Amino acid sequence: MAIERTFSIIKPDATRRNLTGAINALIEKAGLRIIAQKRVQITRPQAETFYAVHKERPFFGALVDTMISGPVVVQVLEGENAIKAYRDVLGATDPAKAAPGTIRKEFALSVGENSGHGSDASETAAIEIAQWFSGNEIVG
């Protein structure tokens, strides 16, 4: 199995409710190491750039508004098959369809306020990590 890195965001709906520690516990229980983490306030231009792939989708404006509504925690996670492992612990985008014990099933408020983001592929992870972290901030 391959040791990979992936990118995670703990979204404003979760940070607002002080769930960072509980979410980190689920991440670590899944066998992933948190090798970089910081709390930031995303600006509108940052959110629009980060979610540019969704620009033409009807939910784009609401997504950007949600992401700038409060602080987020951005993270780099590392472990065996980290991208899949994190997406598994994150759960389905719709919390009603997420498996019990996943971040979204346990903590999400709705599809729009679903507590987390995770990279969907190694290429995406590399781009997302580089957008939020410099090399010396990642200590693995």
From Swiss-Prot:
Its EC number is 2.7.4.6. It holds the Pfam family NDK. Keywords: ATP-binding, Cytoplasm, Kinase, Magnesium, Metal-binding, Nucleotide metabolism, Nucleotide-binding, Phosphoprotein, Transferase. The active site is at H117. ATP binds at K11, F59, R87, T93, R104, N114. One of its GO terms (molecular function) is nucleoside diphosphate kinase activity. Gene3D superfamilies: Nucleoside diphosphate kinase-like domain. GO terms for biological process: CTP biosynthetic process; GTP biosynthetic process; UTP biosynthetic process. It is an enzyme of class 2 (transferase). Its cofactor is Mg(2+). It comes from Methylocella silvestris (strain DSM 15510 / CIP 108128 / LMG 27833 / NCIMB 13906 / BL2). One of its GO terms (cellular component) is cytoplasm. Homotetramer. This is Nucleoside diphosphate kinase.
